[in-house]
Amino acid sequence: MATKVTIQDIANELQLSRNTVSKAINNTGVLADATREKILRKAAEMGYKQFAYLPLFQEDAAKTAAPSILPSDKREIAMLTARFLNSSHFSSTMLDRFQSEIDHLHSCMTIHRISLIELKEKKLPSSLNIQRTAGIICFEVFDYDYAQMLCDLDVPLLFVDTPVMDMRPPLKADRLYMENRIEVQNAVAHMVQRGKKRISFAGDKNHCQSFFERYMAYKDAVEYFGLTEGLSTCAMPSGQQNYPVSLYETIRRFKTMPDAFVCANDFVAMDLVKALNELGYSVPDDIWVCGFDDSQEASYFAPHLTSIHIHGQIMGYTAANLLMTRIEEPSLNYRTVYTETNLILRESTGD
């Protein structure tokens, strides 16, 4: 059996610290681009699990690239989003990988923001030329009716996360998610093992399918451990207007505060920590908090935030594969794919 390659093995080969290698592989912290590139190349060369199936060198991949599968009059890959995606969003790393993987198509990637009016009226962004569009990838498109309109375009389509799909007809498109259940349940188990009994959830579970799955994973876990008291102190205000204020007002009304919170994402977690501090509670001394995404901010927020890491590079590679194969074979059955996530323990849970 082949020996499993570890982060320490890569560090030894490059004579770098394990922490430096971990930052490059998990896309956290600040590193020089040359150092990050050197580490990722060595990881691929050594067969590290996260990079073993990626091209070792982009130059080699470009040299051997096949002719474009796209017709000459349809060379645009359109990215649609209903909100601004900043560098803290997991899509930042993912899109870098996605774009590098579709380079051989000789296509251009265009980005289109869906306005509130376009969302309401179920119209495409005015900047999008659908006649020249070979495929569409969607981020933060969580309006179900709008998503259905996109499915009716008869254009190869990939959703990265979706509206909440329970009790609704499935979208006629490929769907890509990060794994939302396993590590949330591991986080709850970790809290229980460390003596936490009243564990609650924070975040709008109906915001998107991933938030819903994270909530259901949390709920299943506390029910499994027989610790359902925390269900009564979940902080789940809905909507995006003044969310930090809504969250603060929600937890301010609690007569009994939980021992710990599992949050829908890191930004909910950070808003929650600030609200708890305003109410006189300390994290982690009084209450533990776990986020999701492992955003750049998680590692330097005070306290350093326990989170669940999304592998953006792997999601980017998978997204490119899903969309390219859909373009090549439009009649394929629709696919739903989940990519691995990992629990990262830090200060906000006493680690």
Where are these regions (language model features)?
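Amphipathic helical "hinge" segments at domain boundaries
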Residues: A2, Y48-L124
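Hydrophobic alpha-helical segments within soluble ligand-binding/sensing domains
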Residues: D174-A202, Q241-E249, A269, I310-E328
